[in-house]
Amino acid sequence: MGCFAKIAAQAGILAFLQFGKTITESKKEPIKLLKLLDIFASLNKLRLDFNRLFGGAACIEIQNLTRDLIKRVIDGAAEIFWEIFVQVELQRQSPPPQDGSIPKVVSSITDYCNKLLGDDYRPILTQVLVIHQSWKHKKFQEMILVNEVSKIIKAVDLNLDTWMKAYGDTTLSCLFAMNCHWHLYKDLKGTKLGELMGDSWLKEHEQYKEYYSAIFFRESWAKLPVHLSREGLIMFSGGRASARDLVKKRLKTFNEAFDEMYRKQSGWVIPERDLREKTCQLIVQTVLPVYRSYMQTYGPLVEQDASSSKYAKYTVQGLEQMLLSLFLPRRERYGSFKGRPTGSKIDNGVDLRRTASAVA
């Protein structure tokens, strides 16, 4: 090894090349592709300087290590890129999130593909694929990158269809579909990936979100107001005692249905804040006006009853707070209003006329 080569080695060039080799030998995960592309871009920028500085026979070890590293980087990057589609397909066998939230693989893959199509990585990945194809004596086709990314996203679509069918609860399945379709529409609109998939694809996901949202409401919260029927109570036709019994019965049925629905859905998650707030507001608009009106009109019938708190179980304000606290991600639940039914009960002895006035 010549004098200059020794100085270069002592300066850390060999250690740098060895470090790059170590990265190529580590586990081949999708996120590693970006690191390999960064390494390739750095080596490519230094190529002319490397050739000028280390082109002599004395630097043969550095030359060999550099060529080996470049080959490892290109082979590794290409291998990971072509493996992404396979990995997405394999994820189809995994169960969907129990809380109906967006699977991490969906959000990570869409974000990942957006980066690959972006101005920072697309030219580098294209160059890597061109070189890799030439080594295999294959002609590089211009659309190979976008076609593969499109295929990956369509595989994600198929995963969503499969995961939806894995839920045993229709409303949870619909909530999951709402989450995923809204994520694909909202997060990809105006992005490189969204442009690739096209406006019709984006619009389709927006429409699917609306469709499953309608089913979600129809199969869950829209069923609650029917328990507060006014039939037979308009003129207290059966007498005050009969009317009171009927009101108590209907309030009890409403409370049981509400408690069960709230208990079940309080563990579900809508990660996107705008969708969560809109969903909660729609639930409030579906349930609260009917409950408020019913309590204003018929609350006084049970106010003198010793067990009134069993029937007039919630204040309107308490009910609203509970509904608005639904679907929070786990990390946001702590320190916020939990909305437990026990926390919104009217204590024994509280004048129910205050409840009636509070709903005005």
Give a label for each model feature:
Residues 1-360:
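Long alpha-helical rod scaffolds of large eukaryotic non-enzymatic complex subunits
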